[in-house]
Swiss-Prot record:
Compositionally biased residues, Polar residues: 31-43
Pfam annotation, one family: T-box
Keyword list, A-Z: Cytoplasm, Developmental protein, DNA-binding, Nucleus, Transcription, Transcription regulation
Function: Required for pectoral fin formation. Together with tbx5b, involved in eye and heart development. Required for the looping stage of heart development. May bind to the core DNA motif of promoters.
Name of this chain's protein: T-box transcription factor TBX5-A
DNA-binding region listed in the record: 62-237
Subunit structure: Monomer. Homodimer (via the T-box); binds DNA as homodimer.
Record remark on domains: The T-Box domain binds to double-stranded DNA.
Basic and acidic residues: compositionally biased ranges: 17-30
Length: 492
């Protein structure tokens, strides 16, 4: 490594005020011994009135480790901070006088360097240096008591290779050697900054010299940066970066931090209930028990959701899914429950053919018909032991975005009075009202739905056994469209 001694020649030449400095150093030997880790700086220039000021480099051992290998500092177009950070301890200031602390970076020599065979060597003459910029500490101006109270940090200073940088960063050339300097200027109201009579002093630390690079050349410097800089994530593995991010966030946050990879997996696995993923909507025991005996068959909230293929292929069709009778509600406990007639098709097959009336209502053979109200009341008390809470009805998990279909004219409306009184308890969307009313028509030449009792007419058919016409609350009523379906063709 070729160091130029011309730049630091003033460091070894005594100035006019050095005898007084030597006396002060003799008096403060104990003080220097106490802070031996940060010895006094090499003083380049001291004006009259600034003689007693001492500056000590913070983390001198770390700077020495880098200096022995050959310190490198990354420069980018946007600007990059230095590491190790430039921090100093200042003593000897007048507590009541205001000072301005600033820093600049000057060329250490007139050479251009290259890194080959694991060492730096001179490769040519240096490029013309850009006009030097000064970085003024953000706390300036401040009293001497303020500067001496704590460490003075220049960690916000950034280095750039953009010669047109508009942000005030220090402009450097790559593969050139530079030396940082710190200046202490007395802020006098009578004398403006930069005038001939302004008192200031400059301090230089040779171990802070570095070579500006766009990428680290020496792998030893890279290793030192990783070991000592908690923010040097660019050369670590992805797992180390993730763990480092989590540890930093966990130390400042009270809630647990989840890795990004886990979040992506969870988001990818959980789908909306309308995309066909039944796992996206997990039903609790209380909710599933309240849907367990609707319409004479047991079902869960998952059974009421459409499969993915049918939803995407038939977005404009209402379709039914076969539901199984659960083992939790055997037919012996609930005599009104009758299973569906088994068909030869698979359980996952979606069908659009019209069912017979006995099948759609869960009746088999000549079993007596029981009204909907009695079935709902029995289901209420036969469900889970905990008191039922208001849960969304089947209309709430239907397809509200599907427009209503045109319904052909029907001859009679045997369910008209029952539905009108029942739907008066709550306001329903237009689509559901149209769909429910269309199902109430039973006799149609093209419907293909047969009535179980031709002799019973209207309300006589509904209440053939003389049961009381009790209307259950709206949260327990059932949409009759779950099991009854018109014969829709593909054209509709």
């Amino acid at each position: 490594m070729a160091d130029s001694e011309d730049t630091f020649r003033l460091q070894n030449s005594p100035s006019d005020s050095e005898p007084k400095d030597l006396q002060n150093e003799g008096k403060s030997d104990k003080q220097n011994a106490a802070v031996s880790k940060s010895p006094s700086s090499q003083t380049t220039y001291i004006q009259q009135g600034m003689e007693g000021i001492k500056v000590y480099l913070h983390e001198r051992e770390l700077w020495t480790k880098f200096h022995e290998v050959g310190t490198e500092m990354i420069i980018t177009k946007a600007g990059r901070r230095m590491f190790p950070s430039f921090k100093v301890k200042v003593t000897g200031l007048n507590p009541k006088t205001k000072y301005i602390l600033l820093m600049d970076v000057v060329p250490a020599d007139d050479h251009r360097y290259k890194f080959a065979d694991n060492k730096w060597s001179v490769t040519g003459k240096a490029e013309p240096a850009m006009p030097g910029r000064l970085y003024v500490h953000p706390d300036s101006p401040a009293t001497g008591a303020h500067w001496m109270r704590q460490l003075v940090s220049f960690q916000k200073l950034k280095l750039t290779n953009n010669h047109l940088d508009p942000f005030g960063h220090i402009i450097l050339n790559s593969m050139h050697k530079y030396q940082p300097r710190i200046h202490i200027v007395k802020a006098d109201e009578n004398n403006g900054f930069g005038s001939k009579n302004t008192a200031f002093c400059t301090h230089v630390f040779p171990e802070t010299a570095f070579i500006a690079v766009t990428s680290y050349q020496n792998h030893k410097i890279t290793q030192l940066k990783i070991e000592n800089n908690p923010f040097a994530k660019g050369f670590r593995g992805s797992d180390d970066m993730e763990l480092h991010r989590m540890s930093r966030m966990q130390s400042t946050k009270e809630y647990p931090v989840v890795p990004r990879s886990t979040v992506r997996q969870r988001v990818g696995s959980s789908q909306s209930p309308f995309s066909g993923d039944v796992q996206g909507l997990s039903a609790s025991g209380a909710i599933s028990s309240q849907y367990s005996c609707e319409n004479g068959v047991s079902s869960t909230s998952q059974d009421l959701l459409p499969q993915s293929s049918s939803y995407h292929e038939h977005t404009q069709d209402y379709h039914c899914i076969k539901r199984k009778v659960e083992d939790e509600c055997p037919a012996g406990e609930h005599p009104y429950k009758k299973p569906y007639v088994e068909s030869s098709s698979s359980e996952d097959d979606h069908y659009y053919r019209p069912l017979s009336y006995s099948q759609s209502l869960g009746l088999s053979g000549g079993a007596p018909y029981r009204p909907e109200s009695s079935q709902r009341q029995a289901c209420m008390y036969a469900s889970a032991p905990q008191p039922p809470e208001p849960v969304p009805s089947l209309e709430d998990i239907s397809w509200p975005g599907v427009p209503p279909y045109s319904v052909p004219q029907m001859e009679r409306l045997p369910y008209q009075h029952h539905f009108s009184a029942h739907f008066a308890s709550r306001q329903m969307p237009e689509a559901h009202g149209m769909y429910a009313s269309s199902v109430s028509h039973q006799c149609s030449p093209s419907g293909g739905i047969q009535s179980p009792s031709a002799g019973l007419q209207g309300n006589e058919y509904l209440y053939a056994h003389g049961l009381q016409r009790t209307l259950s609350p709206h949260q327990y009523h059932t949409v009759h469209s779950v099991s009854i379906m018109h014969d829709w063709n593909e054209a509709s």
